[in-house]
Regions:
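N-terminal leader segment of winged-helix/HTH proteins
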Residues: 1-34
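C-terminal regulatory/oligomerization modules of transcriptional regulators
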Residues: 1-5, 128-147
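N-terminal positioning helix adjacent to the helix-turn-helix/winged-helix DNA-binding module
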Residues: 8, 41-42, 103
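Alpha-helical linker/hinge and terminal dimerization helices associated
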Residues: 19, 23-26, 30, 64, ...
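N-terminal helix-turn-helix DNA-binding core of bacterial DNA-binding proteins
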Residues: 21, 25-70
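Charged, amphipathic alpha-helical coiled-coil/dimerization segments
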Residues: 76-136
Length: 147
């Protein structure tokens, strides 16, 4: 490690979520500019539901790394916005399945374009090779630290 030097402030900025926070702020701003009233957190839930509709809140927690109270709050807000509905599982009445509404489904194309555009803005000036290395480093950090 002695010969390896790194920018400790940059490392902790990444690990503390500052990069993620900056991208989320930009994404939220870009959504609002296009008239889409969702947060980046809500978008990650929609993303999971666009991939597989009708999943449990626990599945959404696992997919988004959110705790149960945070997920409940997010889904409550998304129900008020008519983006999702909770329906009791026919096999297990104690479990609610979360489904997209028509409004939630209609956001997929436009919001995905905005997310891709935001990501392109964030990655401006970064080569494909740098991206591959960065992804691999972050993947290893995640693997080393996940519970």
């Amino acid at each position: 490690m002695g010969q390896f030097k790194f920018d400790i402030q940059l490392i902790f900025a990444i690990l503390n979520g500052k990069v993620s926070t900056a991208i989320n702020r930009k994404l939220h701003r870009n959504f609002r500019q296009e008239g889409i009233d969702i947060s980046p957190e809500q978008w990650t839930i929609l993303l999971s539901l666009w991939e597989k509709d009708g999943i449990t809140q626990q599945d959404l927690c696992n997919a988004t790394f959110k705790d149960k109270p945070s997920m409940t709050r997010l889904i409550d807000n998304m129900e008020r916005q008519h983006l999702v509905v909770r329906i009791s599982d026919k096999k297990d009445k104690r479990t609610n399945l979360v489904y997209l509404t028509k409004t939630g489904r209609e956001l997929e194309s436009q919001s995905f374009k905005i997310a891709i555009s935001t990501l392109h803005e964030a990655l401006q000036g970064i080569s494909v090779e740098e991206m591959k290395i960065g992804q691999e480093v972050l993947r290893k950090i995640f693997t080393n630290t996940k519970d």
